[in-house]
Amino acid sequence: MALQGPIPVEFGLVFPAGVYAAGAFEPVRDFEASASGRFVQSKDKATGVPLWVVEVIDADHTARARTVKVKVAAQAQPVLPAGPAGSPFVPVEFTGLTVTPYVNQAGRLGYSLKASGIRAPGRPPGRPGPEGRESAA
């Protein structure tokens, strides 16, 4: 089969109504390497770069899952773009988005989402934002 591993997808195809970050990025725990209270951060299998995860809220009111976790590989903790003043939710877009299908413990098809970077919505790829650079891996 020609398709193996993560499948590249456009952000708008996965999230046509956009998403809102519901908190900051957290390190992904490597459950096999972490033991007896010792935390080990998971690394990207292809690059060896540390993995971070952020929970996002799908703005599509018809979406089956309202919240989704998206992983980003980056040497340092990614920073969310500035959001609207006074709002706990930050609109974001992911760059270099991939989806990896898998069968979950209940025997149902699930999807893992991973991105190479994050930015404010509506900004063309590679164009710096107000912070002067695109947050990415």
Q: What is each model feature region?
A:
Residues M1-A137:
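OB-fold and OB-like single-stranded nucleic-acid-recognition modules
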